[in-house]
Every structure is written in structure tokens, then in C-alpha cells.
Amino acid sequence: MNSQKASKMTGSLKKNDLYIFDLSEQLLNSLKLMSFDSTLREVEVEKTSDNDRNKESGDLQIARKKVTSNVMRCSVCQMSFDSRNEQKAHYQTDYHLMNVKRNLRGLDILSVEEFDALISKEHGIKSEDENSGGEQTSSDHEESEEASDRDPDLQTNNYMETIIENDLQKLGFQKDESDAISHINTQSPYIYFKSKYLQKNEVLAIYKSLFNKRSLSNPNEALTFWNSQENPMAISALFMVGGGHFAGAIVSHQRLNVKGNAHKKDETLIEQAVNFLEHKTFHRYTTRRKQGGSQSAMDNAKGKANSAGSALRRYNESALKTDIQGVLKDWEPYLSKCDNIFIRARNVSDKKIFTDNTVLNKGDERIKSFPFTTNRPTVLELKKAWCELSYLKILPKPEPLAVKETVQKLEVSNKKDEFKEKQEPLLEEIQTEEIISLLKKGRAPLLISFLKKNKLDGNFRLKPESKYSLTPTMLHYASQQGMKQMALILLSNIKCDPTIKNRLGRTAWDLNRNDDVRHAFQIARYNLGESFTNWDETHIGQPLSREQVDEINEKKKAIENEKAEKLIKLELEAAKEKQRFAKDAERGPGKKLTNIPSIQQQNLNSLTDEQRRRLMREQRARAAEERMKKKY
């Protein structure tokens, strides 16, 4: 414990005083845990849990004594019997089972007349629902028959459960809401504390994710342990991964001494005090520019592409996973001692990188997520995240919710249920739901069978019109949703009318969003022929055969591959150039050699002036002789 802080504690708190692993004794002793009810009103909690547990155990013992009584009477249904056989038969009835379930849930016991009336009412509602939804598929009907054959009492049990749940919703809602009193019930990621060093309308907040299941029940005890001498070497792990970027660190709970450090532009003194025992960052090219998302996600969504860029991204994804797991293996001695392991991963595949190894287990309670948003994984971002986690925050005291919201919540839900019961769905709306479901699943044979069975044509108007005003027909809906295969089948096989327009005057062709759907319309036009309809009114482009569409797609793919290859070449050249510059910078400019005279020049310099003149005359004479020989 920092004794200097304890002696200098004043009424105003500074950011540096709020580090949860280095709190002053005065501040630590002043923290008072706050508890709230369901309306976010502060409640003073009294320690009566032991008395309540003793009372509950006594009630259980009394209940057991009643059950094991030799009197021929049902203590649940409040009925007496003349013989033991009658009593045994009663225990096997649905009436007794209903009252047992209601008794366990704290509801009133029903009489025989009330039970018969409720069951009859529920049977009536069920039969009406079945009649209104009569357009049931044959497979669903067979499944329901098989279920009833397997368990003849299943339907009655479902009725009883429905009745009990309705009664619980009506009678137990307000009680459940008012009884939810806890320091965890803050409707936020924080736990709140009061302190005499704060203003009346202020509280100190700490993230719940810093606690495990045991310490969360007693946060004051956990804070005391964190600040004691028993916990001097505590560490935590921080990992972030996303977009091909990775950053990881092992952080000590003991801060560095930054007294006298200079202020940096991108890093505060508090961030400079973060003590990273180990840290590692690296990046690999795994996401396509301006597209986002990993290559594996794109493969799952649109199929596996065969371009050079996609192959490079797949390789880098695998390499990134190997690199991260290598870091985890190297840091295994640290990870085994960590109190917390915070991981930020954008998707399930990134999260599996950390758990698909022998270092970390998926069920490890130390593994947690950051309870706030983070930026690109870097060392500086890890420091910011640790500062956000490890410092108490001075926040305004939570405002209680309006009482009317809680009181009227059940009334509003009941009114909505009543409105839904009164507003019975039309047959056309039920048929529309089935058609939309088959379209989404791509079940063309079942869709054709459904239309024939219900005597519907391909131009069936989807209901309600307010919901499907922009997509009034199946063809409009398939075009807007990008269902290329279903659009082709609707035109070629079901013979939907492509000239129908929505309320904005747009045909199904006008709603398409990609080339695949456009090509499906053009293939259908080619298959149906020009005599099928007035194609000018449909706005569909020129007819194309499947071979022509395949040729267009191949050209498009070749252009994309060429662009990707050029991009990769440019990146490789840039990397080589960068590497060459780095080597040149490392080697330095070097020393230039002075001009060295030739051997002939060295020989001339060694002669005297007379010898040099004589040599020059001889050379000129030889040259003249050579010229004369060539001339004659």
C-alpha cells in the first residue's frame, strides 16, 4: 500500500489515485458498495441471508413431513379420500399434477371445476388456431401425428404449462421486478461505489469483467486483496486481433515510475506507466482493399475464388493463426499465472485461434472480452485498453427509471397479446409467409408444389400490401433479394409475368442489384423467346445464352485476376525497393577510389624529358610508315 498516498489524500481525487491495484488505504476504506433494484433506485441491503436460508430449510422440512404423512389426504389439492387406492389414483391425475406445478411456482390451488374450465378453454383456443392455420404442409402434419403417438399426454402437459405461464406472467411480474436487488443490477458494465471523497451526485465505477464469479459477489474483498502485499506479482494478458493485425502483451499490475518523464504527443503519462513484461505485434495481408472481411468469410459466403490475391490471403490467414499460436506457446509460463486474459476478436474464427491449442482452454473463466470498443490492434491501443480497465471512473450517479415504465410494462404487453389474438391473420398472409420461406431457402420443387396445391399462379400478390408494396410479386422479391436461381426458375418454369410493376412503376428487372441476377433474367428471355411477352415493357436487357454468360464471367474473372496479379507485383517490387534502400542505408555511401594512372602513363612519367621526346618521335615515325603501307 502506498503510504505517501494515504497521508496526502484530500477531498479531490486525481486520475493517478484511482489505479485499482494501487489505491490508498483511506480511499479503499471509504468505498461503499451500492445496490440497486430493477428501477435503478439505490437500496440499502441488510445482511439477512442466513435467516432467510434457515427459514427456507424449515419450510422444506415441513413440506416433506406433509408429503410423507400417513393421513389419506392430498395436502396440495386439499382433498380427503376414503381409501388408499383412491389417493393413489388421484396422484396420477392431471388435476393433481397441475396443482403441484402451481404450488411449486407459488400460485393458488385450483378446484376441480376451475381446472376443467381452464382446460376446456385452452382446448378451444388450440382448435381455433389449428383451423385458422389449416394450410399445414404434409410433413408438418406427419410430424405432429408422430409426436402425439409417442406421448399421448404431451398435449395436455403443454396446455397446463401454458396456463401456468400465463398466471405467472400476470401475478408474478411485479414481484420479480421488485425483488431484483443487487450490486450487479446496474444495467451497465460497471459496479458502483460511494465514497466520502466524491460529490453527492458522483460515484466510482469499476468494470464487472475484472472480477471472476466468486469475487463478483464481494467486490470490496477483491479490491482489498488486489491492493495487499499478498498479490505483488499479479499479471494479466491482453490480446487483440482483427483485419490481419495482431497485438498481444503481458501486463504487470505494478505500474512503472514515470516521475520526471516528458509528455508525449500520442501517449499520456498514465499510459507510459503501463508495465508490459512482454509484447508482440505483427500484420499479414488477409483482407481485400475496400471490401473488408476475411478471405475465409468471403469463401463461405460466395464460394472459393481462384485468384492469386485470394490464394495469398488464404495463406496469410493460416500463417497469422500459426504466428499467434506460436506467441501463446512462448508465453505459456506467463499465461498460466495470469489473473485475467482479455481477448478482442471480431468473429468466431478469430476467437478459435486462441482456444484451439493446448495453452488456453475454451472454458477458462479467466478468458474475457473487452467491455468496450477498441481500435486497430497496436501496442498503444493495448495500453489505452489497460488504462480503461484498471482505473476507477468518476461518473454521475445513475438516474432511477420512471416508475410508470415498470408499472405499465405488463399492461402494455397484455394489450399487445390481446390485440394479436383479435387480429387473426388472413389466409393470403399465411400463404405469403410460406412462399417467402421457400424462396429464401431456394426450395423450387416445394414452391411449385405449394402453388399447385393451393391453386395459385406465378403472379400471386404478396400480402399484406403495406409490407410488400415494393415487391408485390415473387419475381420482384427474388430480384430485390439477389436470388438469381429462383428468379430464373420463376421466369422459365413458373412463367411469372415480368411486366408487372410495383407502386413506384418498377418491374422486377429494375430491382436487381448485381450482374448475376441480371444474367438470370437475360437467360430466361433467351429460353422463353421473343414471343413470350413484350420484353420492352420488362426493361430486361438483350437475351443471352448460358454459354455467352459463362464467357462474360470468365472475361470478368480474368480481368480481376490480372488486376490482382499486378497489385501483387507492385507490392513485391515496393517491398524489394524498400529492402534495397534499407540495405543501402545500412551500408552507407562508402569511399570513392582516386584516379589511378594507366601503365603506359606510369612508364612515361619514369622517363626524362629527352627520352620522352625520342620515344614520341619514334611513335610518330612508325605511324607514318603504317600510313604509307596502307596507301601503297
Curated annotation (Swiss-Prot):
Resulting phenotype, residue 283 to A: Does not affect ability to release incompletely synthesized polypeptides from 60S ribosomal subunit
Pfam families in the record: bVLRF1 (PF18826)
Compartments it resides in: Cytoplasm; Mitochondrion; Endoplasmic reticulum membrane
Enzyme class: hydrolase
Compositional bias per record (Basic and acidic residues), positions renumbered to this chain: 578-589, 609-632
Alphabetized UniProt keyword annotations: ANK repeat, Coiled coil, Cytoplasm, Endonuclease, Endoplasmic reticulum, Hydrolase, Membrane, Metal-binding, Mitochondrion, Nuclease, Repeat, Zinc, Zinc-finger
Protein's membrane topology: Peripheral membrane protein
Main localisation: cytoplasm
Domain comment (free text): The VLRF1 domain mediates binding to the 60S ribosomal subunit.
Summary of subunit composition and partner proteins: Associates with 60S ribosomal subunit. Interacts with CDC48. Interacts with NPL4.
Assigned protein family: Belongs to the ANKZF1/VMS1 family.
Additional free-text comment from the UniProt record: Present with 3930 molecules/cell in log phase SD medium.
The protein's role, per its UniProt record: Endonuclease that cleaves polypeptidyl-tRNAs downstream of the ribosome-associated quality control (RQC) pathway to release incompletely synthesized polypeptides for degradation. The RQC pathway disassembles aberrantly stalled translation complexes to recycle or degrade the constituent parts. VMS1 acts downstream disassembly of stalled ribosomes and specifically cleaves off the terminal 3'-CCA nucleotides universal to all tRNAs from polypeptidyl-tRNAs, releasing (1) ubiquitinated polypeptides from 60S ribosomal subunit for degradation by the ERAD pathway and (2) cleaved tRNAs for recycling.
Name of the protein this chain belongs to: tRNA endonuclease VMS1
